[in-house]
Regions:
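Solvent-exposed serine/threonine-rich low-complexity stretches and specific carbohydrate-binding patches
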Residues: 103-141
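N-terminal secretory signal peptides that target proteins for export/translocation
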Residues: 1-33
Length: 527
């Protein structure tokens, strides 16, 4: 439930201010995507209601004059001109199901002209994007606080009607501004060599790997100007993909697509474990089949059941726990479907370290070398939206858990509270959570592979009928030696070294080519 007594404050963080996204980072419900909000044709209309997604609430969509209209509200929004000079936003996109069709949810393109969309209240603005895959909704001027319910009207490229079904999804993002920054700390394993990324390096590219890694441990091919070094502005997901977020995605796929993204047939019995099959609740993944599908015609319906009692989507069923067991193809397909894309290693370091920030040798994402262990074996309110570690202090990070089926990742953003600083919350310079520990991030990069063709093309919202991403020039297999390195460490990282911001010790490891208990991820998008 929403906390109606939230307060807002700014937190001093070295040379910057990070807005304390109080209840966004508090002990509260943390669903990452809006639950399926469906408006049905008049002769099919059953019932619908507004549903909570993290602190973002999107009301039931309705069709008004060929446009799609719904309400949006969220807590603790910010837009600050002070360092780091960024803001939060909600990435909103729409899926459409033709009434009486094949149950396929297709991506619905939106107008590419911002003026064709609107939002009431005078506080927010709608930013269209050039490919029409979605829109960003954000504050239009400097300020902070809760966003009251506002009516959003989206103009679809194909007019909405009263017989089709619509789902509106929203995910919290953080704007990462244009600016210089440093890659590498000169100390961590296989680190980049301390190069400063500037407008000039972005425009010129890198002739070879020795230009950014002293031992040449990078791309076989020269990195051209089109390769995203991180200098230019982009948006980054505030949190790692959550288990409920992944469930909502699976529930929007066809039966055939579900086969590709799970380990067992969607027609398997109720209670089957589709993401991992070794044992129930393996490494705290609580995704199960709630309603079996029918081969080739009707997809399964998945749900969360972390406490393994057979009742789905209860308060303690781990909906807000970071989703693990995501292979490179799993994450890439999810990002393509969402209209996002993978980040590069260099962008990862930009998000974590910040722009114009002095280098700290062996630093973690929160900007210093202090680290405090948190594990899923010592929790309060385990599995709930209020899940927190019993440990508290500076540099708290989910790492060091035993390699067993009972330990796993924690709730997304578990370390942040109403009055935590960046160091206490384990937050990045820009306010992005859990970039060290919890689950490995998956980034374009690594070693012994030519990933120079990656040009940062965003996903288009559409995946193949076989259930695979198909955006041009994305590395296909993943793995440190196939263009998709794992960064940031995980709940199972034994030594804190691989949790360091600039550590690249997984550059030769291809373990994320298949589902692993320690791997998850998040996406980014160019504006």
């Amino acid at each position: 439930m929403k906390n109606q007594n939230s307060t807002n404050s700014f937190i001093r963080i070295e040379n910057s201010y990070l807005f304390s996204i109080q209840n966004v980072l508090k002990n509260k419900l943390r669903e990452k995507y809006v639950r399926s909000l469906i408006v049905l044709g008049s002769f099919l209309c059953l019932s619908s209601s507004s549903l909570l997604a993290n602190n973002v609430v999107i009301g039931t969509p309705t069709v008004v004059g060929g446009n799609l209209q719904f309400t949006i509200q969220w807590d603790n929004s910010w837009n600050t001109a002070l360092g780091p000079g960024n803001y939060d936003a909600v990435w909103v996109f729409v899926k459409r199901q033709v009434c009486g069709g094949t149950q396929t949810w297709n991506h619905s393109l939106l107008s590419t002209v911002s003026g064709n969309h609107s939002v009431t209240g005078g506080v927010l603005q709608v930013d269209a994007v050039s490919d029409g895959v979605g829109v960003f909704i954000r504050r239009s001027a400097a300020g902070n606080g809760n966003i009251a319910s506002s009516i959003v009207t989206l103009n679809l490229q194909t007019a909405a009607n009263l017989v089709d079904n619509f789902q509106v999804f929203g995910v919290e993002m953080v704007y990462i501004p244009t600016g210089n920054f440093i890659i590498g700390d000169g100390s961590s394993q296989y680190t980049f060599n301390g190069t400063t990324i500037t407008a000039a390096t972005q425009a010129a590219g890198f002739a070879n790997a020795n230009a950014y890694q002293s031992s040449g441990h990078g791309s076989f091919g020269a990195l051209p100007a089109a390769y995203p070094q991180g200098y230019n502005a982009f948006y980054c997901m505030k949190y790692e993909v959550s288990q409920e977020q992944y469930v909502k995605y699976l529930n929007s796929l066809t039966f055939t697509q579900q086969i590709a993204r799970t380990n067992i047939s969607p027609a398997s019995a109720t209670g089957s474990w589709p993401i991992q099959t070794a044992s129930p609740n393996n490494a705290r993944n609580g995704i199960r089949i709630m309603t079996p599908g029918t081969a080739t015609t009707t997809p399964a319906i998945y749900g969360c059941d972390l406490n393994v009692n057979g009742t789905f989507n209860e308060a303690a069923d781990g909906q807000n726990v970071a989703c693990n067991w995501l292979s490179w193809p799993d994450l890439m397909t999810y990002l393509d479907w969402s209209g996002l894309r993978p980040m590069t290693e260099m962008e990862y370091e930009k998000v974590a370290r910040g722009s114009g920030v002095p280098l700290v040798a062996n630093e973690y994402v929160w900007g210093n070398t202090t680290i405090l262990q948190a594990t899923s074996g010592a929790l309060t309110n385990g599995g709930q939206g209020a899940e927190v570690s019993t440990a508290s202090g500076n540099g708290i990070c989910a790492y060091g858990s035993a390699n067993s089926t009972t330990f796993g990742p924690l709730r997304c953003g578990f370390a942040a509270g109403a009055a935590t600083t960046r160091v206490q919350a384990g937050a990045s310079y820009y306010g992005v959570m859990d970039m060290s520990g919890n689950v490995f991030e998956q980034c374009v990069g690594g070693y012994n592979f030519n990933y120079s063709s990656f040009n940062g093309l965003n996903g288009d919202g559409t995946i193949t009928a076989a259930g695979l991403f198909n955006t041009a020039n994305w590395p296909t297999a993943g793995g440190g030696q196939a263009g998709g390195i794992a960064r940031g460490g995980s709940f199972n990282s034994g030594a804190p070294g691989e949790l360091r911001l600039s550590d690249r010790n997984q550059m030769t490891n291809n373990f994320n080519q298949s589902k692993q208990s320690v791997v998850g991820g998040r996406g980014v998008r160019i504006p």
